UniProtKB/Swiss-Prot annotation:
Highest taxon listed in the record's lineage: Eukaryota
Pfam family, one: TMEM251
Function field: Required for mannose-6-phosphate-dependent trafficking of lysosomal enzymes. LYSET bridges GlcNAc-1-phosphate transferase (GNPTAB), to the membrane-bound transcription factor site-1 protease (MBTPS1), thus allowing proteolytic activation of the GNPTAB. GNPTAB is involved in the regulation of M6P-dependent Golgi-to-lysosome trafficking of lysosomal enzymes. LYSET is thus an essential factor for maturation and delivery of lysosomal hydrolases.
Record keywords: Golgi apparatus, Membrane, Transmembrane, Transmembrane helix
Localization in the cell: Golgi apparatus membrane
First-listed, main subcellular location of the protein, grouped into a coarse class: Golgi
Organism: Bos taurus (Bovine)
Cysteines engaged in disulfide bonds, as pairs: none
Membrane topology: Multi-pass membrane protein
The name this protein goes by in its record: Lysosomal enzyme trafficking factor
Family as reported in the entry's similarity comment: Belongs to the LYSET family.
Length: 163
């Protein structure tokens, strides 16, 4: 059981008002048991989720504008391309014709990869950081498969000695 702080030795009133800065409880014990990388990982996860909430709000506001622009684009009759049309206008019309789910998938994959990387930083074992990123995951799986094949080949070459 933690000992209550002795306020008789505190000299200034601010320290007396705030206390010693030591908190007790399971959350504080868990926080103290983590190393620096894990703490920064959890702070990163929290900030990432907070920024994600703000970004999702912004995206859904843009979704209404995107739908309106896409509908305007579809409702227009296809006209012959004007010679004064710039490549940026042409690119904009082609990108607007892509469905919203396509843009969702394009942005969701890197989003999940970043989230899973930050989450992997919260693990106690530093060797497991980054295993959830797709290229690293594929490399680990291929390496394990090659190691398994190599080990099974070595085992098959061993001669059993019957005594």
């Amino acid at each position: 059981m933690p000992k209550p702080p002795d306020y008789s030795e505190l000299s200034d009133s601010l320290t007396l008002a705030v206390g010693t800065g030591r908190f007790s409880g399971p959350l504080h014990r868990a926080w103290r048991m983590m190393n620096f990388r894990q703490r920064m990982g959890w702070i990163g996860v929290g900030l990432y989720l907070l920024a994600s909430a703000a970004a999702f709000y912004y995206v859904f506001e843009i979704n209404e504008t995107y739908n309106r622009l896409a509908l305007e684009h579809i409702q227009q009759h296809p006209e012959e391309p004007l010679e004064g049309t710039t490549w940026t206008h042409s690119l904009k019309t082609r990108l607007l014709s892509l469905p919203f789910w396509f843009w969702t998938v394009v942005f969701l994959i890197p989003y999940l990869q970043m989230f899973l990387f930050l989450y992997s930083c919260t693990r106690a074992d530093p060797k497991t950081v980054g295993y959830c990123i797709i290229p690293i995951c594929l490399a680990v799986i291929c390496n394990r498969h090659q190691a398994f094949v190599k080990a099974s080949n070595q085992i098959s070459r061993l001669q059993l000695i019957d005594t």
